[in-house]
Swiss-Prot record:
Any one of the GO CC terms: cytosolic small ribosomal subunit
UniProt keyword Cell membrane present: no
Membership in a protein family: Belongs to the universal ribosomal protein uS3 family.
Pfam annotation, one family: Ribosomal_S3_C
Alphabetical list of NCBIfam families matching this protein: rpsC_bact
InterPro entries: KH_dom, KH_dom-like_a/b, KH_dom_type_2, KH_sf_prok-type, Ribosomal_S3_C_sf, Ribosomal_uS3_bac-typ, Ribosomal_uS3_C, Ribosomal_uS3_CS
Keyword line: Ribonucleoprotein, Ribosomal protein, RNA-binding, rRNA-binding
This protein's record includes keyword rRNA-binding: yes
Subunit-structure text: Part of the 30S ribosomal subunit. Forms a tight complex with proteins S10 and S14.
Protein name: Small ribosomal subunit protein uS3
One BP annotation, GO: translation
An example molecular function term from Gene Ontology annotations: structural constituent of ribosome
Amino acid sequence: MGHKINPKGLRLGYTQDWQSRWFAPKNMPALIIEDKRIRELIEERFKMAAISFVGIERAGAFLRINIHTARPGVVIGKKGADIEQLRKDLEKMTGSKTFVNVVEIKNPETDASLVAQSICMQIEKRAHYGAAMKKAIEKALAGKALGIKIMVSGRLGGAEIARTEWKREGRVPLHTLCAEIDYGTAEAMTISGKIGCKVWIFKKTHFAKSPKEILHELRKHREVTETPSGSAETVTEAK
């Protein structure tokens, strides 16, 4: 099961926290769709900002967006113009009072989503997929990751028949629930068609702790990195 399911979904509430943190007794389907539209808008507008994920919190008529990115300057824009325009557009879309925070990812080489995006960008620039995977693995291990696995699939190198290839270094214990596994995917658009990339990164193991204690630590860490201040606020995330 651990090799088939999304490792983040398998560990939700244990070593992984939710990206959408809210509860609504009514209109939940509509709000879930709204979350999807918010993420699509942000990812489409800031394609070159190296966005890992977008956290969403709701409280009554208030909406808080936390954008986790390796390039906060691209999101904020000159004198905060871009992020302010984004806030206005989100308020118009949702009808809620919106606050937007930018959280800087300090170590992008150990963030699975950013690693997958980087590999796909290199493939789109016609770099060899094997060299891109090898370079990503070296950077991740240098960034103190305990293990990494990368898989690419599609018409690799313009081949007539699609295939899947993967590389792994170190340990990636997908069945161990107390292991903190980061997982990310991305797609590269080439002249031969789409090439998909999946990345698993093993960061650390939580020993001798209950699920409640681990989840409390995760939320405490997010409270430090996600400050509920002004719309152009930037903080640093230590990963």
